[in-house]
Amino acid sequence: ACDLLKWLQIMEAYEKGGYAYHATMPTDAMARCRDAMRETENFGFDNARAAQQALGDRVRALLTATGFLSVAAEGFQAPGVVVSYTDDADIQSGRKFLVEGLQIAAGVPLQCDEPSDFRSFRIGLFGLDKLHNVDRTVQLLEQALSRIC
């Protein structure tokens, strides 16, 4: 966790001509996070929310139409990540997506006594580039799926 009070104390020590060391501040990460928050604010939080929901809905519908059923039950489906069943080890591992230039995440065990041959895969729908280009994002996935399946 980032203890901002501690960093305030570090800064104040320097301002008073002193010295203090706690750890290396993750300034690059904080600056990038700030920039992403500003970009989201400029896009509009309501627009971002609507685009994320539309993207999640469309990707889930595309996967379902392609034969990949959602692991999450209706009403419990997150708009930012889609987890689907597969029986193909190369889809589960992401290998077939990688050949198409897409990165996905392998599925993880549900830890609820699923059978040993249980397989799933996850598609993360993160990033403002995807929210700014929902149609393009879905189209690229659709094209890749047409070659994978």
Feature locations, PLM:
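Short amphipathic C-terminal alpha-helix that caps PH/PH-like domains
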Residues: 137-145
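Alpha-helical structural signal in soluble globular domains
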Residues: 58, 62-66, 144
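Conserved C-terminal alpha-helix-loop-beta "cap" of PLP-dependent enzymes
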Residues: 64, 68-136
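Flexible, glycine/charged-enriched surface loops at secondary-structure junctions
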Residues: 44-51, 68-74, 149
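Active-site C-terminal subdomain of aminotransferase-like
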Residues: 1-61, 129
